[in-house]
Design a protein with these regions (language model features):
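A short acidic/small-residue loop/turn micro-motif
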Residues: 111, 276, 387-390
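Central antiparallel beta-sheet cores of small beta-barrel/beta-sandwich binding domains
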Residues: 25-98, 130-133, 139-211
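Bacterial Sec-dependent N-terminal signal peptides
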Residues: 1-30
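Structural microenvironment flanking redox-active thiols in thiol-disulfide oxidoreductases
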Residues: 295-339, 350-359
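N-proximal helix/coil linker or "cap" segments that precede and/or mark the start of modular domains
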Residues: 222-262, 274-278
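Surface-exposed beta-loop interaction hotspot
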Residues: 116-149, 244-250, 256-258
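Short active-site neighborhood of thiol/selenol oxidoreductases, capturing the structured segment around
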Residues: 269-294, 300
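Thiol/disulfide oxidoreductase modules built on the thioredoxin-like
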Residues: 337-340, 346-406
Length: 413
């Protein structure tokens, strides 16, 4: 649904406010934000909910809400009418002119320094994520679905959709072999499905139509101007993804692993260093740009805090920009904002060539993140590719329980 027409009046007010001598206050309460990720895609603007409030110190604070997730933006600066909001964990930021009850500006998915701008609009007082879709829901998609992305093409992929529906409101996620799409929220209007998410890494919009025979057809997906697909889905309570064991395995040869990468100080760190000898080590292929890596890092941070004194070490091999200098700031921010105190190393530029070189003895799907579990003898005992985060509910709970049990078992050996 095209949302721009709903906020034209509010933006006119913003222009008038900009002409006044006193900068407009950022109004407290609920807001609806909209990102125009690709202006050539009509009806695919990406809406998201925001709440604005004052902290105890009287400072502006903004909260982005996607289904069960609340993302607090506390790094906010103001220069005249211009507001800059740095989203947590990642390098994305919003720069907008403040009107009486509106905002207008840019969402920079990789930070203002990168220069890529998605047009950003927001208006106060709207809580409906898709307010132009007013028809009562005539379909219910509660449950599990088998999702086919790009059906009938060489790029065809099977995923699992899990949704909850209350009235017209729909929440849920898509699970795939690399992880999940995190927290999706939207609605059904008539038979039309609309879902979106904005979390600092993702800018997602999904649409589709529930057919008379209960399928979902004419699905469209967009995550960026270059990340687009079509999809269909059928209800399937038994829909499942391939097992991790079928996706990734070790090449023939020694069941060991070695790395030599630089830390944030530029010093070379090796798995053969004394720091890791006789320890249980988790090595994870990660990246400061990766939302599923963020979810894994937060969990691994808890594991490290609980078990480091008992002999657990965790190393994140980060695949980033062209060199450490250009990647250091994002890596430091990622580690700090996820609360991770374990070892972060620069593994090289993001890309298949570097990944294949660093993770030299892994075969199959090596997604971000991919984790290697190593016992006290230095032997690889388990590989895990992808990460199903907290947005997947019971899948996340099961993964946390299984991983924790494995770590405890290895520490006792």
């Amino acid at each position: 649904m095209k949302l721009k027409s709903l906020i034209v009046g509010a933006l006119a007010i913003a222009a008038a406010a900009a002409c006044s001598k006193k900068p407009a206050e950022l109004a407290q309460g609920p807001w609806l934000g909209v990102l125009v990720v690709d202006s050539t895609e009509q009806g695919m603007e990406v809406p998201f909910n925001m709440n604005v409030y004052k902290t105890a110190a009287g400072l502006d604070s903004v909260e982005i809400v996607n289904a069960g997730e609340k993302i607090a933006i506390t790094e906010i600066t103001r220069s005249g009418d211009t507001l800059t909001m740095q989203l947590p964990v990642f390098t994305s930021e919003i720069v907008a002119v403040v009107g009486a009850d509106s905002l207008k500006g840019c969402y920079y998915p990789k930070g203002k320094e990168n220069g890529t701008c998605y047009k950003f609009y927001a208006v106060k007082g709207i809580t409906d994520r898709f307010p132009a879709a007013t028809e009562a829901a005539t379909a219910n998609i509660q449950g599990r679905w088998e999702v086919i992305e790009n059906p009938g093409t060489p790029d065809s992929t099977v995923m699992v959709g899990e949704f909850k529906q209350e009235g017209a409101k729909v929440t849920g996620t898509w699970l795939n072999t690399g992880g999940d799409m995190r927290y999706l929220e939207g609605k059904i209007s008539g038979n039309k499905l609309m879902l979106s998410a904005v979390d600092g890494a993702h800018t997602l919009i999904m649409t589709g139509e529930v057919t008379a025979d209960g399928k979902i057809a004419n699905g469209k997906f967009m995550g960026s101007p270059k990340w687009k697909s079509v999809w269909t889905a059928v209800k399937n309570d038994n829909a499942n993804l391939p097992t991790v064991e079928s996706l990734i395995h070790l090449k023939k040869g020694p069941k060991t692993f070695q790395f030599a990468c630089v830390n944030l100080k530029g010093d070379t760190v090796k798995l053969s260093d004394n720091q890791f000898k006789g320890k249980v080590v988790i090595v994870t292929a990660s990246g400061s740009w990766c939302p599923n890596c963020m979810d894994e890092t937060r969990f691994f941070s808890e594991l490290y805090t609980k078990y480091n004194a008992k002999g657990l070490e965790i190393v994140a091999l980060c695949f980033e920009g062209k060199d450490l200098e250009s990647s250091k700031k994002a890596m430091e921010r990622f580690a700090k904002q996820t609360g991770a105190n374990y070892t972060f190393l620069y593994a090289g530029p993001r890309g298949k060539e570097t990944k294949d070189k660093v993770l030299y003895n892994l075969e199959g799907q090596v997604a971000f993140p991919t984790s290697i579990f190593i016992n006290r003898k230095g032997e690889i005992v388990k590989l895990h590719t992808g990460f199903s985060g907290p947005g997947t509910g019971e899948h996340y709970t099961q993964l946390v329980e299984e991983t924790t049990a494995l770590v405890e078992k290895l520490l006792k050996e």
